[in-house]
A protein has these predicted regions:
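Amide-donor transfer/coupling interface in amidating biosynthetic enzymes
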Residues: 1-107
């Protein structure tokens, strides 16, 4: 679902106070698919272990996400959007497009 965004650094809305990934095992035991930019507030606002923003199960079918990518679809939703970009939608839309394609394939 997120493979087309591999290596990207993207802004995203965070709006939670209670959510936090507590991961007691070593990082290699988890399928962490997205991380906050750096450890600590404000980048990692809830202090999640290993700067974890998103986790996926081993099959790739189940994604758990703390950031609100659904609130970051359009450039006017972003607090800061890079100058000179001409996107109609933000790169986060890729996650939803990929999910739909996967669903259509496994019908």
């Amino acid at each position: 679902m997120l493979s087309s965004l591999e290596g990207a650094t993207l802004g995203v809305w965070i709006s939670h106070g209670e959510g936090k990934f507590n991961l007691p095992m070593e990082e290699k035991n988890y399928n962490i698919v997205a991380k906050y930019g750096y450890e600590g507030y404000p980048s990692n606002p809830n202090g999640s272990d290993y700067n974890t923003a998103m986790l996926c199960d081993k099959t790739g079918r189940h994604l758990v996400t703390m950031p609100h990518i659904e609130r970051s679809m359009f450039q006017w939703n972003w607090a800061n959007y890079p100058n000179g970009r001409k996107d109609e939608v933000s790169p986060w839309l890729e996650a939803f497009v990929s999910a739909r394609k996967w669903l259509e394939k496994v019908k």
